[in-house]
Amino acid sequence: MSEATPFGIYLHIPYCKAKCRYCDFYSAPGARGVPQSYVDALLRELAKNTRRPDTLYFGGGTPALLVPAQAAALIEAANPLPGAEITLEANPDVVTLETLRGFRAAGVTRISFGVQSADDAQLRRLGRTHTAAGAAQALAWAREAGFPEICGDIMLALPEYTNAEFDRTLALLRDGGCTHISAYLLKVEPGTAFYRNPPAGLPDGDAAADFYLYAVQQLEAAGYRQYEISNFARPGHEGRHNLLYWNCSDYWGVGPAAHSCVGNVRRFWPDDVQGFIAGTVAEQREGDCTSEDYLLMQLRLVSGLNIPAYERRGGRFTTAQRVFMRQCVGHGYAVWDGEVFRLTPAGMVVQNAILEELM
């Protein structure tokens, strides 16, 4: 592959202070930092790569448990291209102004905070370990540290949720200088504390859809342009790394539970942090990237599915599916100009049902 072809690297940092009650990601809770042995294992794998990335993403877990010197070593080993986007996820309560300055000096260009809510009781219910005031402080420190991109997450349709809670959370992120906001619905996944003991007051599907549509409206009004189902940005501040996923470009994941798609081949690492450190586990082939993957990812984007590009990947819509697509337009779920089929916010609410008909 040419370096002109977009390429990103994802580094999984599974360590976190505590497991949130809704989290189904592979993680190692109870950590106060990231063991150097784990960083060394990442460096070992990065040394095998010869392709310089356009984006580098530290995900977790809580990557901000790294010390800046560890992050700097990993960034240097990844050898990103000039102007690369380098993202680090953080919880508000694990950073200080000093550590944020250290991450910025190490080369991180984009800091992403899991704020979720401006309601302290809600944060406790979720199992989060920060407060709304702590989130506001972390955002202020990020501005002072000089990050050009500051991102915040909002969870929607939480227990006992109201639009007023969303408004307060949006105000916290907007006033905190966020250039990018992710807003996504709570999903109660198997294996989570919420699945074992569901919280009272969860909104039903119709109410959750209303919360989502309200969030889209308010984010747009606040100057955050929607570009993907759950992602909104000031113009020019869209997340470049996740766009690699949604455009089915090449990305390489490193670390336990990390996934890759390079050269149309999907691979993954087993959920085994000790095996990864010891070098006794290896990436496994998961399958090929298909035209259905492309359809699934492209319909997440506001820009929609380019049908000629889909057909070049081997995809085809039947006559019945094209009739269904026209029905989606008639119901206000989609816009279709013949070449590009894209979902409206109302269509994004029922995206899964639409995909069932098109795949």
State the predicted function of each range.
Residues 14-27:
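Local cysteine-cluster metal-coordination motifs and their immediate loop/turn environment
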Residues 4-8, 27-316:
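C-terminal scaffold of the Radical SAM
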Residues 329-339:
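A short, conserved structural fragment
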